[in-house]
Amino acid sequence: MIVRGKCLGRSVSKAVSLFSRPISVISAKSFATTTNLLQNSKDDSTEATIPWYMREENSSPVEVLNKIEVPELPENSPQSLQEFVTLLTVEYGLTDLEIFDLSQLPEDHPKSLEEQNEENYVILASGKSEKHIYKAAYELRLYIKHTYKHLPIIEGMSSNSISKVTRRRLAKRVRRGPPATASTFGIGANSWVSCGTGVDGIVIHLLSRERRESLNLEQLYSDEQENEESHSTPEIDQNRLFFGDRRGFHTSSRNFNLNTLSNIYDSYVIDGNFDTSQKFKAQFDLNFKGGSVEEHNKKFELYRAINLVNANVVEANEIEQIIWDKYSSLDLALQQEIDWNTEIIKDTIKYMEFLVDLNARHSPREKLDKLSGFISNITCFAGDSIDLFTIDKFGALLWRLTWVSENNNALDSANLNEIIKRKGDFEPGTNTISFDNELGRNIRELLRQNKYSSNKETFPLWLREQMMYTFGQAGLWDRFWRDWQSILQSLNKTNERIYFWVVTALFLSKVDNRDALRHLFTKYWSNPSGASFVADYTTNNHQFNSDNERMALKNVLVQIGEKYNTSPWAREAAQFADNL
């Protein structure tokens, strides 16, 4: 009863307080509510009398979709280009298409038809998402397969179905930790899919908007002048409180000092010689402060250049000491924006290039011993584990350190390409090197175990070609021809095989080995029962990839015929050159 009394008392007090309010307010509120109810009921009754299919819909207005803009096609473009553009825009819904005609680029452009013969037209397109790009790439592959009866070369396209072997590899890689060169490129699946269609030299790149902005492939396929005009600087909010202020006195001072050091280095590269090396070194040391990583790197470049010209002014141990001074600098250690793992990788590559420049001053074993000690010491400054074998240039330089050349005129792919540009014009001379066969075998096995350990993976073509040229200049012709046959069999396109035949003839002529030339022209040149140049030349409709390539082969064959005119195979080569 007491509890009930308390509850009843509370209810009575609430009722009294409620009715103690002004009567006018209560009646006004009740009247407004009643009016609204009557109005709503009237509207409901009116709407109920109208059939549902005649009532006005209260939906949002329909937005008009923007039409996809189709870019203009280049003049004299093939019909297949129009088909791919229509397919990408109308069927797949890709946007922001750009078409690049590589025949319009200047001859010295790295993507011009004079420099490469695989790409004629490049299409860039943006997808809405990674799933959209994957679906478009999947449909594009099926279209090319059924229309042109071959499978295109597609890279960057990955689905959710991963094999057990791949999962084990990924798990093993996770346990090792990310390499120092790890980046976001390639991690996001289907953010960049490249498709070599194999049709009229058309290459298609499908990218997400973020990846397209970060890669800026337009710069790669555009003329440099056009790219500079279209380059836009980021907008700056001029209403900001600190607009126009510099980062600070120390930063501006470091930039000014770096410019001074860069000018000294550029002056030495242009005007420096054996006698003025000491003067440039003293001027550089006078302005060197060591307040930034860039200053130490510029000092390394200058000292390395001086060492090549006058080794008495700058010795090899001084160049190595520059690197250790950079990592022991307290001023640099306090700068948190420095990525030391990246610096370690760059310095390792630069040190290996310096060892290559030493040439015959040290033997290959001495150079590799120096490199081993350098890597052991510099990796102590790394915050994370670094896998140098993931860097292609590291493997190439590692192989390069297995041999030395006294006259520094060794041949490689770049030299042979330059000879083709000069239409076969080269200075006569014997190209021989001193190759450590045991070291070469160990380095080859080291690369295979650390980077190419999978049964499905082999040495890339550029590395196999580098090794092949090494064996040829070292006089190891059995290993040369074995690698040569392996490379020739791996080339599926006829135009690639034609180029390989031309550079082989140039290489053997430059090395000037009579037995090797006789082996080429008697066994492979016009072999009716196997691979031969004549067969590939006929299959390619008696065409070369460029006129420079044709003239280079013609001039080399004429030189071989004149030098070995007593040999039947040399005379046949000269007769073939007369018809080119």
From Swiss-Prot:
<keyword id="KW-0999">Mitochondrion inner membrane</keyword>
<keyword id="KW-0472">Membrane</keyword>
<comment type="function">
    <text>Probable mitochondrial mRNA stabilization factor.</text>
</comment>
<dbReference type="InterPro" id="IPR040152">
    <property type="entry name" value="Atp25"/>
</dbReference>
<comment type="similarity">
    <text>Belongs to the ATP25 family.</text>
</comment>
<dbReference type="GO" id="GO:0140053">
    <property type="term" value="P:mitochondrial gene expression"/>
</dbReference>
<keyword id="KW-0809">Transit peptide</keyword>
<dbReference type="GO" id="GO:0048255">
    <property type="term" value="P:mRNA stabilization"/>
</dbReference>
<feature type="transit peptide" description="Mitochondrion">
    <location>
        <begin position="1"/>
        <end position="38"/>
    </location>
</feature>
<keyword id="KW-0496">Mitochondrion</keyword>
<dbReference type="Pfam" id="PF02410">
    <property type="entry name" value="RsfS"/>
</dbReference>
<dbReference type="GO" id="GO:0005743">
    <property type="term" value="C:mitochondrial inner membrane"/>
</dbReference>
<protein>
    <recommendedName>
        <fullName>ATPase synthesis protein 25, mitochondrial</fullName>
    </recommendedName>
</protein>
<dbReference type="InterPro" id="IPR043519">
    <property type="entry name" value="NT_sf"/>
</dbReference>
